[in-house]
C-alpha cells in the first residue's frame, strides 16, 4: 500500500471510530499534535479530548502530497471538515491540513491544523 493510501485508510478508520485499528497503525511512542499545541500519544487520548466539542465530524479529503526524506515519508492531507455541533447544527467547508510522518510503515507523527475554532461553528445554536 502506498503512503497516501495508508493515510486515507487511517483517516477512514477515524471517521468510522475504529480507534483500535487507528492505533495499530501508529508507531510506539508516536506524537499527535492538535491546534493550540495539544499533544497526545494515543488515538484514545485524542478521541477522549474531542468529546464534548461536536456530535460528529468527518473530512472531505481533497488532496494528498507525499514526500520522502531518508527513512521517513511525509504525507499531507488537505481538505475540509463537515459535521454537526453539539446543538445539532450542521457545518461544512472548514479547512484542514493533516501532516503525517511515516517510518517503517507506521505513523510516527500526526500534526493537525484546522479552522474549526476560528470558524465559530461549534458555538452556533
Q: Model regions: which residues?
A:
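A solvent-exposed, acidic/Ser-Thr-rich amphipathic alpha-helical stretch
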Residues: 19-24, 28-73
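Short acidic-aromatic low-complexity motifs
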Residues: 1-25
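Exposed beta-sheet edge and beta->alpha loop/turn motif
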Residues: 80-104
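Hydrophobic pocket/interface hotspot
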Residues: 10, 22-23, 30, 46, ...
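Residue-level structural signal for beta-strand termini and adjacent loop
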Residues: 45, 96, 113-115
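A short hydrophobic beta-strand element
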Residues: 71-81
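Low-complexity, intrinsically disordered terminal/linker segments enriched in charged
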Residues: 109-125
Amino acid at each position: 500500500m502506498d503512503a497516501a493510501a495508508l493515510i486515507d485508510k487511517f483517516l477512514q478508520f477515524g471517521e468510522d471510530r475504529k480507534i483500535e485499528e487507528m492505533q495499530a497503525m501508529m508507531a510506539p511512542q508516536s506524537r499527535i499534535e492538535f491546534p493550540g499545541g495539544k499533544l497526545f500519544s494515543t488515538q484514545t487520548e485524542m478521541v477522549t479530548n474531542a468529546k464534548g466539542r461536536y456530535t460528529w465530524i468527518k473530512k472531505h479529503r481533497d488532496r494528498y502530497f507525499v514526500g520522502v526524506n531518508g527513512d521517513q515519508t511525509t504525507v499531507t492531507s488537505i481538505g475540509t471538515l463537515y459535521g454537526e455541533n453539539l446543538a445539532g447544527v450542521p457545518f461544512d467547508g472548514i479547512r484542514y491540513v493533516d501532516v503525517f510522518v511515516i517510518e517503517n510503515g507506521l505513523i510516527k507523527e500526526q500534526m493537525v491544523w484546522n479552522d474549526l475554532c476560528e470558524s465559530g461553528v461549534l458555538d452556533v445554536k
